[in-house]
Curated annotation (Swiss-Prot):
PANTHER family: ELONGATION FACTOR TS, POLYPROTEIN OF EF-TS, CHLOROPLASTIC
Protein name: Elongation factor Ts, chloroplastic
Source organism of this protein record: Cyanidioschyzon merolae (strain NIES-3377 / 10D) (Unicellular red alga)
UniProt gene name: tsf
Gene3D superfamilies according to UniProt: 1.10.286.20, DNA helicase RuvA subunit, C-terminal domain (1.10.8.10), Elongation factor Ts, dimerisation domain (3.30.479.20)
Localization per record: Plastid, Chloroplast
CDD domains documented for this protein: UBA_EF-Ts
Alphabetic keyword roster: Chloroplast, Elongation factor, Plastid, Protein biosynthesis
Role according to the record: Associates with the EF-Tu.GDP complex and induces the exchange of GDP to GTP. It remains bound to the aminoacyl-tRNA.EF-Tu.GTP complex up to the GTP hydrolysis stage on the ribosome.
Amino acid sequence: MKELVQQLRKDTGAGVMDCKKALQEANGDVVQALNLLKKKGLAKAEQKRTRSTTNGRVESYVHAGNRLGVLLELNCETDFVAKSEPFQLLAKNLAMQIAACEQVRYIEWEQIPSSVIESVKSQVAEQLVEQLANKPVQLRSQIVEAKVKKQLQKQCLLDQPFIKDEQLTVDEVIRTTIAQVGENIRLKRFARFVLGEETGEETGEETND
């Protein structure tokens, strides 16, 4: 039991008593206990996401060949967490994620300008004119909205599959780290630079602080 508790603590950052309780609830099944702890941790993380973040770090990543680079600002609540291994690893992983995601332009859906959404909606509706001709008006609208959301979500970092574990989204990875360190974490902005481009793509600030 002791070894299982230690393993769960290492994987989740949860306390000893929480790990023991999860193992008891899961009847000794480590995988089930891990899932229970993750669910509880993510629920706690949601409660922390409105808290102010005034510390953090600026992370940089330059891809092999020096033709692609990323700068990002990742915020947390205290200097202690900013210097912690989980936070620094998250910053590094996010920078690598951004480097790998050529289509990403925004941190989250709420940052997409309404003018961009309307423009894409018009394009999609025009492309589907013949396909939607015989469908009810309400259904046409639903189909267009779904296509628009699918297309634009590819540009939102938090919605992307995590490059190191595609069963998780980037947002879930951030929430897992929030649960692990016990503080709110917020990706404030990022810029992606490609050699030969006139400017890097930089996002605005998140809106949930």
